[in-house]
């Protein structure tokens, strides 16, 4: 059986005239922190279509360079795969383990740094302008419009891949320093056989 994939390219993307709408804020309770909320940014339906077209362009370029430590939002990888990797490395002799969560990662993404990393592998200025427009589209909630000078919306189609692009240098740096690492989006588990203090310092700087 032959399976065909139909890809719709919005005309505004071809003409370089597309301007995304602000995302809709949608708070959801944090499971492990009663009374605290995680703010999702839900794009309009048409913007989701445009983000999917962008994702289809970015994935083949960046997927081959993502580190083996990364498991979040990647085809063929799951939380179970990440847990199996952690367990295998624990059994191999890791004495020190840190369960780390990158605080407010999606809300604090540096746009300039992210665009610089994308530009290292994407020369098409239209793609770079599109990403910047999505990042700076802003958000709205409770009748107010909020600018977005930092961050990428949790809830956006392309945000997970952008997060992996931004964190790939971190994955590589941990490996170069001799630490084992498993990362799922902004949650990471670095491990080492010795030097507990240096491991903690490496994660927090």
Task: Go through the PLM ranges and name each one.
Residues 12-27, 65-69, 73-77, 81-205:
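Conserved polymerase palm-domain catalytic core
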Residues 8-11, 29-32:
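Intrinsically disordered, low-complexity linear regions
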Residues 51-69:
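Electropositive, glycine- and tryptophan-enriched low-complexity nucleic-acid-binding patches
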Residues 34-43, 51:
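Glycine-rich active-site/cofactor-binding loop and its immediate structural neighborhood
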Residues 45-46, 50-53, 87:
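Duplex nucleic acid-engaging cores and interfaces of nucleic-acid transaction enzymes
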Residues 1-7:
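Hydrophobic alpha-helical membrane-insertion signals
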Residues 17-18, 46-47, 57, 61:
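Short, solvent-exposed loop/edge-beta patches enriched in aromatic
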């Amino acid at each position: 059986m032959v399976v065909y994939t139909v890809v719709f390219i919005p005309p505004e993307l071809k003409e370089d005239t597309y301007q995304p709408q602000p995302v809709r804020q949608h708070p959801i309770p944090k499971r492990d922190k009663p009374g605290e909320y995680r703010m999702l940014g839900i794009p309009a339906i048409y913007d989701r279509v445009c983000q999917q077209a962008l994702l289809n362009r970015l994935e083949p370029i960046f997927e081959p360079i993502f580190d083996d430590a990364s498991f979040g939002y990647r085809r063929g990888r799951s939380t179970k795969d990440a847990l199996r990797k952690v367990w295998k490395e624990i059994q191999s002799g890791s004495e020190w383990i840190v369960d780390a969560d990158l605080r407010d990662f999606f809300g604090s993404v540096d746009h300039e740094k992210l665009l610089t990393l994308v530009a290292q592998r994407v020369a098409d200025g239209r793609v770079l302008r599109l990403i910047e427009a999505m990042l700076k589209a802003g958000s709205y909630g409770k009748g107010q419009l909020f600018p977005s000078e930092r961050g990428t919306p949790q809830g956006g189609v392309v945000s997970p891949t952008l997060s992996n692009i931004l964190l790939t240098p971190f994955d590589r740096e941990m490996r170069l320093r001799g630490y084992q690492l498993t990362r799922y989006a902004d949650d990471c588990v670095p491990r080492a056989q010795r030097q507990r203090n240096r491991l903690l310092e490496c994660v927090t700087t």
